[in-house]
Amino acid sequence: MSQDLSAALFKAYTPLLDEAYKLASLTSKLDTASELIRYTQGSREVVVPKMTLQGLANYDRASGYVGGEASLTLETLTMNYERGRMFSIDSMDNEETAGVAYGRLAGEFLRSYVVPEIDAVRFATYAALAGTHPTDATINATGWYALVSAAQVAMTEAEVPESDRHLFITATGHADILNKGLTESKVFFDNFASVTVVPQARFYEAVTLAASGAGGYSRTTGANNINFLIVHKPAVIQVLKHQDAKIINPQQNQDADAWKFGYRVYGLNDVYDNKTKGVYLHTSQVTS
């Protein structure tokens, strides 16, 4: 098999990474619709629409309407998340088998390392930009129901639309609300567009990304644990792109008799500055 053909086999797996991401990620449901964004500068920047309106004014029968402004501007934002990793797979007699090995490696890497980090970064980003952020040292048993209910009321009072609100909550909080009974908890959860249980390991107020070594992320020292996060989807800008895999065949590899595969992902996670009330954060204090 030619090197060109085998490289094509490896690259054929790249589009599948997008599908694997969507299935494994807890936050992919918040991805901004592709028709609402436009890429510039080699996909390093995105252009998103931003609408500004004015309220009603008096109408005078003699002079008519009071002038007002309605503007739709395009805001350019730079990608704020970019990560990568280079892998090596020993050269094999059957290069097609090497392609399958890469597919399995990439899939497992995405599920076990990439997706948890992407979710954690997004939660931390939205936490930092949340319009409302109460904190409790502890939450009493059966207290979660009241706290999430209060969050819903606060968002409604802030005139955040009740549709398209997504609840992200810890397993402890989810279980506590379920203890209210099947009927009551179902009615409660049905108020949300979706309810997602998030492992605490992805649910921090702030995270630190490792620059080298084993890579990955960790809770930033002093950052609180997130109890729950309610996101009105139109309030956030969430974009993710997978770079086509960089393939170096064994003949070109000067370090070893192995295939090298470069994986790279970049994206944008942000909250519209005029829609911060569309993100409600509740955290618990931690001691370290």
Locate each region found by the language model.
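Short, Φ-rich (hydrophobic/aromatic) sequence segments
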Residues: Y13-K22, L147-A151, F228-K246
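Alpha-helical scaffold segments that mediate packing/assembly in large oligomeric complexes
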Residues: D93-V160, Y280-S288
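Extended, compositionally biased alpha-helical segments that mediate assembly or anchoring
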Residues: A245-S288
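Extended oligomerization regions of viral-like shell subunits
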Residues: G42, V46-V47, M155-Q243
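Structured, hydrophobic secondary-structure cores that serve as assembly/anchoring elements
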Residues: V47, L53, V66-G67, T73-A101, ...
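Short helix/loop capping segments that flank catalytic or ligand/cofactor-binding pockets
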Residues: L56-Y59, D176-N179, V271-Y272
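N-terminal "assembly arms/tails" that initiate or stabilize quaternary assembly
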Residues: M1-T76, H282-S288
